[in-house]
Amino acid sequence: MIKARYFYLYKLIVRCRFFIAKYNTLFKQQVIEFYIQNGKNYSLISKHFQLDSRTLRHWINQFNHSRINGLAVLGKTRNYSLKFKLNVIQTVKNGQFL
């Protein structure tokens, strides 16, 4: 039941385009530079930067394919007030979807 609630919240967020980039391009670039300079161990680097190793692998693949442009954050990130975010969560809890 709890997983279903999170799934609905996720769907609502995706549908409303509430996507907020977790990592900016500069951070991704720093991680890639560290990867290139200090060896190619996904596990150690992902632990050092507290990343999921799949995320690191994805960034490296993007970098290898398109260089720095592949790391760019696509789309416009938005900042929402705490009040708005709580309102969205309350709406999901009450089952009132779009």
From Swiss-Prot:
Protein family according to the UniProt entry: Belongs to the IS150/IS1296 orfA family.
Organism: Haemophilus influenzae (strain ATCC 51907 / DSM 11121 / KW20 / Rd)
Protein name: Uncharacterized protein HI_0112
Gene3D superfamilies named among the record's database cross-references: Homeodomain-like
PANTHER family: INSERTION ELEMENT IS150 PROTEIN INSJ
Pfam families on file: HTH_28
InterPro entries: Homeodomain-like_sf, InsJ-like_HTH, IS150/IS1296_orfA-like
Source domain of life: Bacteria
